[in-house]
Regions:
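Stable alpha-helical elements in mature extracytoplasmic
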Residues: 32, 162, 167-174, 248, ...
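Bacterial Sec-dependent N-terminal signal peptides
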Residues: 1-27, 234-237, 241, 256
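Cys-His-centered catalytic/binding microenvironment captured across papain-like cysteine peptidases
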Residues: 26-64, 73, 79, 85-146, ...
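Surface-exposed patches in mature extracellular/periplasmic domains of secreted proteins
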Residues: 48, 180-190, 264-272
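Active-site-adjacent structural segments surrounding the nucleophilic cysteine of cysteine proteases
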Residues: 87-245
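Extracellular hydrolytic enzyme modules, especially secreted metalloproteases
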Residues: 170, 181, 224, 238-252, ...
Length: 371
């Protein structure tokens, strides 16, 4: 099993800045490194004197330039610097560990890819009118959800011990937060790989005895968690596979309502349904209402990935990737879709982002959502 590293990480959305209009302007690796040193000096002075070494870049093949640079700090941590001065210089950072491009959560890879595409758009004579502005969000609230994963011991009851699937893991994390239901209703069956998979949900879920973190030596304590993830996998017709198990977030919403007593008013929405600005406000409202948000981001080439948003800090959101705490931290999850009077001014590369709103236990009571 991969060694899990806890990251305190903040990834900042690409913010177009300037006056009425802007033009993209590339920055060199040397300039980016100076910005990295400046960042450490302001945010983490204890790391300012350590060397920052470039370890990764994302190249824009159509332009022959780099969309961002990643610098590892010899004292621990790394910072991601934009390769264009039309966006916020610091795209993300962590105070611990090191950047490893070969060992990142798939959802994070998708977000990084979308940022790369957005900077590419800036390089193609892109202009954005930014005369319409709003006050920045401020404040902080964290719900601190369980640091669960998809492999052992969580996959104890899956066919061939295949990984549980990101949808099942994300759903289990949200259910653990609510500690609901005490017992499910009904059962579900489907055919997978020629086998009939079936589960009855009419058994107790012992939430109080489900640990929030796997430490490597408490496998037995996770039996109930493994059963929960198996139940969710069957409830959503999980397509189990050795390389990854897949299902749709929409199917999870249906299952939570049908078998586990969650609100019938819960809704699955795409970011374009609300617009980027309203989207971020709605996410904050969910956290304020004590509702961790099931979230999905997709890549057209490799499919989608589901995870949990469980807090916010100013303009960023706390993301639980469902990787046992690995790479969890603060991210900007909205889109760089500049608008003038409600009209998008450029390509929209984050249209595959989706979330579930108003998801909460019904408890026999239903509160109508305003969505």
């Amino acid at each position: 099993m991969k060694r899990l590293i806890q990251f305190q990480f903040m990834l900042v959305l690409l913010l177009v800045c300037g006056q009425a209009t802007i033009q993209a302007k590339r920055i060199s690796q040397w300039q980016a490194q100076q910005q990295a040193y400046s960042f450490w000096g302001k945010q983490m002075p204890m790391k300012a004197k350590a060397k920052s070494r470039v370890v990764s870049t994302a190249s824009l093949s159509t332009l022959g330039n780099d969309s961002y640079y990643v610098f590892n700090n010899d004292a621990g941590g790394f910072v991601i610097i934009a390769g264009d001065d039309a966006v916020a210089p610091v795209l993300g950072y962590t105070s611990t560990g090191a950047f490893d491009a070969n060992n990142l959560p798939e959802g994070l890879k998708d977000l990084l890819k979308s940022y790369e595409q957005q900077i590419a758009a800036l390089g193609k004579n892109y202009k954005a009118n930014t005369t319409s502005t709003r006050a920045e969000f401020t404040g902080e609230k964290l719900l601190n959800t369980a640091k669960w994963n998809q492999g052992a011991p969580f996959n104890k009851y899956t066919p061939n011990n295949y990984v549980t699937g990101c949808v099942a893991t994300a759903g289990a994390i949200v259910m653990k937060h609510h500690g609901y239901p005490a017992k499910g209703v009904g059962s579900h069956s489907y055919t997978w790989n020629g086998q009939n998979l079936t589960a009855s949900f009419e058994h107790d879920y012992d939430w109080a005895n489900m640990p929030v973190r796997y430490t490597g030596d408490n496998d037995a304590a996770f039996d109930g968690v493994a059963r929960l993830m198996s139940d969710l996998g069957i409830a959503v017709n999980m397509q189990y596979a050795n390389g990854g198990s897949a299902s749709a977030l929409e199917d999870l919403v249906t299952a939570l309502k049908k078998y586990f007593g969650y609100s019938k008013y819960a809704r699955h929405l795409k970011i374009e349904d609300l617009g980027a600005e309203a989207w971020n406000g709605r996410l904050r409202a969910e956290i304020d209402a004590n509702r961790p948000v099931l979230y999905a981001a997709s890549d057209a080439n490799v499919g989608g990935h589901s995870f949990v948003i469980d807090g916010y800090k100013d303009e960023s959101f706390s993301v639980n990737w469902g990787w046992g705490g690995y790479c969890d931290g603060f991210y900007r999850v909205g889109a760089l879709n500049p608008e003038v009077d409600g009209t998008p001014q450029g390509d929209q590369y984050n249209s595959s982002q989706a979330a579930v709103f108003a998801l909460q236990p019904s408890d026999g009571k239903e509160v109508l959502s305003n969505l």
